[in-house]
């Protein structure tokens, strides 16, 4: 099994080849740069959310999504979503993706999957669908 340092070295090599290895780290030329970018983007997003409030932030995201859909067209937008889903599946692993699907399958228009699982006593192990690092 690879040590943490070996794994970081491999991720750094991939980043230096132009691959994004940290979610939110797009544009960073090293692993450390991608981690730094992701942290900054996360903090910036939280600051903006605090400024706009929950509803305003949600609306801003919705408008951005609609704009992107117009730019890419329906098929391009669908392809982008598919690629994102595949990336997320790789990050979580098969077991995590399965567990996330179980939770999503419990959701209804009136109740989230998490709420329903709690109400019905269904165990959903959310630690399985955290990004593997």
Swiss-Prot record:
Residues 24-83 are annotated as: 3 X 20 AA tandem repeats. Pfam families: LEA_5 (PF00477). This is Late embryogenesis abundant protein B19.3. Belongs to the small hydrophilic plant seed protein family. PANTHER family: EM-LIKE PROTEIN GEA1, EMBRYONIC ABUNDANT PROTEIN 1. One of its GO terms (biological process) is response to abscisic acid. Keywords: Repeat, Stress response. Residues 7-19, 32-102, 113-133 have a biased composition (Basic and acidic residues). The keyword Repeat applies. Induction: By abscisic acid (ABA) and osmotic stress. InterPro entries: LEA_5 (IPR038956), Sm_Hydphi_plant_seed_CS (IPR022377), Small_hydrophilic_seed_prot (IPR000389). One of its GO terms (cellular component) is cytosol. The keyword NAD does not apply. Residues 1-133 are annotated as: Disordered. Sequence repeats lie at residues 24-43, 44-63, 64-83. Lea proteins are late embryonic proteins abundant in higher plant seed embryos. It comes from Hordeum vulgare.
């Amino acid at each position: 099994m690879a040590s943490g340092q070996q794994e970081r070295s491999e991720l750094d090599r991939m980043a230096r080849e132009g691959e994004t290895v940290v979610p939110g780290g797009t544009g960073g030329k090293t692993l450390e740069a991608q981690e730094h970018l992701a942290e900054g983007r996360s903090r910036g997003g939280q600051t903006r959310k605090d400024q706009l409030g929950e509803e305003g932030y949600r609306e801003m995201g919705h408008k951005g999504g609609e704009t992107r859909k117009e730019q890419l067209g329906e098929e391009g937008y669908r392809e982008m979503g598919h690629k994102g889903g595949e990336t997320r599946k790789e990050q979580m692993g098969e077991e995590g993706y399965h567990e996330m699907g179980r939770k999503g399958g419990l959701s209804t228009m009136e109740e989230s999957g998490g709420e329903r699982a709690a109400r019905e006593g269904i165990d959903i192990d959310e630690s399985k669908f955290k990004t593997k690092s």
